[in-house]
């Protein structure tokens, strides 16, 4: 991917600032690694809370870094409790907005005075951490915003202000959240066709005009227009029309994904930089050995991501629905995946499925999805999971939880034709039916064929040296980070 820099004096210095949740940290780490390969000195800024979690999950030396790839931390402003701070997104968003600017500014002031690192020359910040813009402007350096959502999800967020102006949000009270309301056709977001209000990110469905997430999204979407450029973890063939529509209302937008494919092409897994990880949970790799014993396309992979919370009743419906399929399955079940209590599976279920299932608390998902034994994915439709599934050619059963997962579900099922949605009020009979359809049915067969085609296009986008995402990454490095472009 182009030339490398050599001496420390020449090195540009990028500061990478992810939003402090797992689904944001992982893709930012990939961007940071790719920039390091390009010759950048990297400072990666976690919150103190996540910095300490990474040390616990990956070992005491996990964040020692390299001379040219260093880790720093700033407080998130939340009180120290036994509760996982990354799970309460409204509290986390409110706190980072109010409390992170001053510590971040002090951190950069300290870095600037150091003689053993190059001067800070650019910032890559999560789009939801826009307080960093104030510091970038003060330093006079370019800042790229990395929105870790799909382009369709991001496009919806950009138009949240119009929902308020049109009186669609907030609603008077919960009784207004009717089927008729949710089926309201939204035909005024550019390049998003056949979309209903129920397909828009969940933060829009509120009764509170002071709703933290509603106002947070509106604010961050507005402030992102001050960035030098915007990058998205998607690829042009997948979301071309939406990305083109963004170009007229935002700074230059560059799709540079799927990032995991780009990283796999550029960085050796067992190299020093390749071994750097960002998982807040300890990965259990035994599942890969288990998958090695299974037939091609025979296993259902089940993972609802790092934030999804369900009730005990929902957990049981999924469990018994999966049991009824007779299929082999690998289920990632976080201990905190059930609201207010530890996830507990009935002994009867464990006994009935003993010879055809594996349960784990966290896993190396990219390796799991690319394993030939995996034939389907029961997912919450988080964007990292959706994109990884698409680029591995694996069709999905979609159970969106919150944020833009509803939008990802809509596009996965109707536009990209790789998903089947399951109702929010999950029932074991429906779980059994859709999983059987996914794995054995005619619709499932067509979805798998479509997923394989998306895999081909994802690989094409990240193929060296001329894939569209490869070229876009070169452009953001050379035109934006190494030579500030005008904010258009």
UniProtKB/Swiss-Prot annotation:
Gene coding for it: UGT85A3
Keywords: Glycosyltransferase, Transferase
InterPro entries, per database record: UDP_glucos_trans (IPR002213), UDP_glycos_trans_CS (IPR035595)
Disulfide bridge partners, by residue number: none
Tissue expression profile of the protein: Expressed in roots and flowers.
Gene3D superfamilies for the chain: Glycogen Phosphorylase B (3.40.50.2000)
Family of the protein in this entry: Belongs to the UDP-glycosyltransferase family.
Listed EC numbers: 2.4.1.-
Residues noted as binding UDP-alpha-D-glucose in the record, renumbered to the chain: 306, 363-365, 380-388, 402-405
Protein name: UDP-glycosyltransferase 85A3
Pfam families named in the record: UDPGT (PF00201)
Coiled coil: none
Domain of life, per lineage: Eukaryota
GO molecular function term, any single one: glucuronosyltransferase activity
Organism phylogeny: Eukaryota, Viridiplantae, Streptophyta, Embryophyta, Tracheophyta
